[in-house]
């Protein structure tokens, strides 16, 4: 079983029409869709927006299905000029940018009393996904910063740490929480985002307009990855 997640229904819609032998499972207001895609048994679900919702759903699905891997897709904002709208960003690692424990003398993003700060994607999944050739835009690898904020131009002056301290390449609201849950549970994971905006004054408008294209791009990438995963052993995370 491979878990495929997106924050919102619109980020997973394209997957649902492609599922073979599709079955719906209801859990606490979430509709989860079990079936087969590219010959692999998968479960596609909305995670909900933000760190708490996405962590909750991810932990439930890991407990319920003991998946081989978790793949999270959807949209992100770019933090770098060379990563443009329409490009695809594969997360080499992820960090919670809004986790700050200065009183404990810990660096930003460090989970107190743990080893978790920058959470790396599974190397085999990352290597496989790096072979994907998007129909539009370019493919990048980099660091994704996650927080319970939708970053726009108004916030960027006070969020310079995203690039200066954390050296982030993209920003979104779920990836690092999913990565943390997967890391603790030793489940291989990959976060792949389509760039919808530049975290600027047009971010909200671009985000809404780009959802359909992002969902199609996510489907293409995941279908490619599923085909490649059938040929390898992920081993232990």
Where are each of the predicted segments found?
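Short, conserved "active-site rim" segments that organize catalytic pockets and cofactor/ligand binding
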Residues: 1-19, 41
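Glycine-rich phosphate- or other oxyanion-binding loops that anchor nucleotides, phosphorylated ligands
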Residues: 2, 26-237
């Amino acid at each position: 079983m491979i878990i495929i997640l997106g924050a919102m229904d619109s980020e997973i819609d394209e997957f649902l029409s492609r599922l073979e032998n599709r079955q719906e499972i209801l859990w606490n207001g979430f509709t989860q869709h079990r079936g087969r895609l590219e010959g692999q048994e998968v479960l596609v679900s909305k995670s909900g927006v933000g760190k708490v919702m996405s962590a909750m759903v991810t932990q439930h699905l890991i407990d319920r299905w003991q998946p081989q891997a978790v793949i999270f897709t959807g949209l992100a904002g770019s933090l770098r000029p060379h990563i443009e709208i329409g490009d695809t960003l594969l997360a080499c690692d992820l960090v919670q940018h809004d986790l700050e424990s200065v009183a404990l003398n810990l660096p930003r993003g460090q989970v107190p009393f743990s080893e978790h700060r920058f959470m790396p994607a599974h190397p085999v999944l990352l290597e496989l996904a790096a072979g994907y050739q998007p129909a539009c835009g370019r493919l990048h690898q980099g660091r994704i910063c996650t927080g319970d904020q939708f970053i726009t131009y108004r916030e960027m002056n006070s969020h310079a740490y995203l690039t200066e301290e954390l050296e982030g390449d993209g920003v979104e609201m779920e990836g690092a929480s999913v990565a943390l849950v997967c890391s603790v549970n030793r489940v291989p994971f990959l976060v792949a985002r389509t760039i919808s905006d530049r975290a600027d004054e047009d971010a909200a408008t671009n985000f809404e307009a780009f959802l359909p294209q992002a969902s199609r791009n996510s489907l293409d990438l995941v279908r490619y990855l599923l085909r490649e995963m059938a040929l390898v052993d992920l081993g232990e995370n």
